[in-house]
Amino acid sequence: MTTTVPKIFAFHEFSDVAEAVADHVVHAQDGALAPKNERKHSVPNISMNALDMTREASCKSTASAAEGKSGSSGSGSGSSKPKKEKRFKIALSGGSLIEVLHEGLLKRDDVRWGDWDIYFADERLVPFSSNESNYGCAKRKILDLIDTAKYGTPKVYHIDESLIDDPQECADNYEKVLIRGFAGRDSVKLPMFDLFLLGCAPDGHIASLFPNFQDNLREKLAWVVPVENAPSGPSTRISLTIPVICHSHRVTFVVEGATKAPIIKTIMERPEKGLPSSIVNEGAAGRVSWFVDDDALTDVLVTKKKYKFHQGLSI
């Protein structure tokens, strides 16, 4: 593995992280929803022709295709529209990231919630009412608090709660949700999210991809894998895979707290260790950003960048 260095933005306080992440999310949203001729320079190192082709394919099957038991909620009526619809496709993990988004996004008036398709990077197989549920936490901390009359209602794609006792069936079902949302596997080899948001746990796992679960880390074909006997938290989960993460238009890690400093040091200084986030840094090189507070960067030898808030589509 080469020593690919991502962009690392450092911040003093949690509130600073939240504000910058929210700006970054809105910038990604604006780039995804803008007319093609306004997106020329939105992201470096990507062929915009290829990106446009992928986006157009992804829009062939709109978010309403996954309504109902297969795991979608939102404002869609369920009726198909022949006209292609621009959507901002975002994947979220759970944990402290939800708090960051709660703090940063809800106070902004430029979030076009009604144009969002929200998927989950992973899910703990617990009831949605549990504080361990990524969807449940996102619903209570973010989705239920959106002024939908003003900003619209996002379409939200979660697991089928009735399948939480069967990790393989739950993973297969959620993969079908992704397939419907991204035009079908016969025409799209991998889904392309406009933005993939991740945290990183002290043990190095991202989404629900754990460092010592090599079969999951080496998975090349499946979009979603079951996770059993997870070493921390709920033992059964599902997770989107490394190829799906790395195929995203942007991949962003959000990390806070001194407890994360040792693992961040390993990720940044010892990429050859092959931790999941190091694999993503390499696999999505040029499209990865880290938003990290000073505590999590304690004794970490990296070049820190100052985040510049965006106006328009320039980076």
Swiss-Prot record:
Q: Which UniProt keywords apply?
A: Cytoplasm, Phosphoprotein
Q: What is its subcellular localisation? A: Cytoplasm
Q: Name one GO cellular component term.
A: cytosol
Chain positions with Phosphoserine modification:
S42, S64
User: Known Gene3D superfamilies for this protein?
Assistant: 3.40.50.1360
Bias (Low complexity) occurs at 60-70
Question: SUPFAM superfamilies in the record, alphabetically?
Answer: NagB/RpiA/CoA transferase-like
Chain residue ranges for the region called Disordered: 59-85
MF terms from GO for this chain are: 6-phosphogluconolactonase activity
Query: Which GO BP terms apply?
Result: carbohydrate metabolic process; pentose-phosphate shunt, oxidative branch; tRNA export from nucleus
- The protein's superkingdom reads Eukaryota
**The protein's role, per its UniProt record:** May be involved in regulation of tRNA subcellular distribution.
Record's family? Belongs to the glucosamine/galactosamine-6-phosphate isomerase family. 6-phosphogluconolactonase subfamily.
Anything else of interest in the record?
Present with 1160 molecules/cell in log phase SD medium.
What's this protein's name? 6-phosphogluconolactonase-like protein 2
